[in-house]
Curated annotation (Swiss-Prot):
Its main location: plastid. InterPro entries: Rossmann-like_a/b/a_fold, TilS/TtcA_N, tRNA_Ile_lys_synt, tRNA_Ile_lys_synt_N. Disulfide bonds: none annotated. ATP binds at S31, G32, G33, K34, D35, S36. This is tRNA(Ile)-lysidine synthase, chloroplastic. It comes from Gracilaria tenuistipitata var. liui. It catalyses: cytidine(34) in tRNA(Ile2) + L-lysine + ATP = lysidine(34) in tRNA(Ile2) + AMP + diphosphate + H(+). The lineage of its organism: Eukaryota, Rhodophyta, Florideophyceae, Rhodymeniophycidae, Gracilariales. It comes from the Eukaryota. GO terms for molecular function: ATP binding; tRNA(Ile)-lysidine synthase activity.
Length: 320
């Protein structure tokens, strides 16, 4: 078997996942594109050499948005069949919903399958260029620090399951070279060239423009920024969680604002967001958030937000 510099890079990445020290069952989420084929090749080569994973399975979610989706599935199954590992195909009824909502449905289906089939790890094919594109998309949508670093190297989603992205430090150019090197059968998805999709326009117009006229290493510069931001965001997140645990009521859905009001504004906002998300699985909007921060807490007050009645009295914020 021929080893390349991407094999070596992959081998250097895997040991960094601390929980990959024993035989594990992994579920590889496929998209059908070049990233998926590259990921399959790297993982199968790695396991053939080290026999590290006790079970490897593949999963593909078909949105049925494309007229050639069935042919794409046959093409993918034909390639995966050489691995002798199980592949699961889920089809979602064609719906007129946004790409973001469809991505969320796909994510839920993959996680549910992983739980039902006792997998330890979900592996995705996101690469470094995907991370840059996601950063630019989120930046234009006005996201905060948390949203800018939304594609972490590794993420724990349940007590038993983690998502890992072993290609996250490998760019699209390297992935394409790898596929050509090993003659991997890339399926050309015509929807990748529809400029009505913002991500495609970023990929084929904005990023080349930034490289040509602003900085040829714009991708690596953005990655460096994201790396630093991720460290700082993690520090703020950990301190926010500590503050939330110290300020929440032990019996009721309530939080003592007196404890957090002297903290930095960034911590105040984070703690309030944690309070609403932890109890109601909702992120409070900026208008309500600013109202709560600026309010005088010596008087009794009620704020109605969606189905919630937010009560404020004597430094306590509580929900009725």
């Amino acid at each position: 078997m021929t080893y390349t510099y991407l094999h070596n890079k992959f081998l250097s990445i895997i040991p960094k996942y601390k929980n990959l020290i024993k035989p594990l069952s992994i579920l590889i989420a496929l998209s059908g594109g070049k990233d998926s084929l590259c990921l399959v090749k790297l993982i199968e080569d790695f396991n053939n050499t080290y026999n590290h994973f006790s079970r490897i399975e593949y999963i593909y979610i078909d949105h049925q948005w494309r007229s050639d989706s069935k042919q794409n599935i046959k093409h993918l199954l034909n390639y995966i069949s050489i691995t002798n590992n199980n592949t699961y195909i889920y089809q979602i009824n064609k719906m007129e919903i946004s790409e973001a909502n469809m991505r969320n449905i796909r994510y839920q289906a993959i996680v549910r399958h992983a739980i039902q089939n006792s997998h330890d790890i979900i592996v995705t094919g996101h690469n470094q260029t995907d991370q840059v594109e996601t950063f630019l998309l989120n930046l234009m949508r006005g996201t905060g620090l948390e949203g800018l670093s939304s594609l972490p190297y590794i993420r724990k989603i349940t007590d038993q399951i983690q998502v890992i992205r072993p290609l996250i430090h490998i760019n699209t150019g390297d992935v394409l070279w790898f596929c050509r090197k090993f003659n991997l059968p890339i399926w050309s998805d015509k929807t990748n060239f529809y400029y009505t999709n913002f991500r495609n326009r970023i990929r084929y117009e904005l990023l080349p423009y930034l490289k040509e006229y602003f900085h040829p290493k714009i991708e690596s510069n953005i990655i460096n920024f994201l790396s630093l931001s991720s460290i700082e965001n993690e520090y703020i997140k950990q301190n926010s969680i500590k503050l939330y645990l110290a300020s929440r009521h032990s019996h009721y859905i309530a939080i003592n604002y007196k404890i957090i009001k002297n903290q930095h504004l960034a911590l105040q906002k984070r703690v309030l967001n944690i309070f609403f998300y932890h109890n109601f699985n909702k992120y409070v909007n900026s208008h309500i958030l600013n109202q709560l921060i600026k309010m005088k807490y010596q008087r009794k007050l009620t704020i109605v937000w969606e189905t919630l009645r937010i009560k404020i009295y004597k430094n306590w914020i509580y929900i009725q």
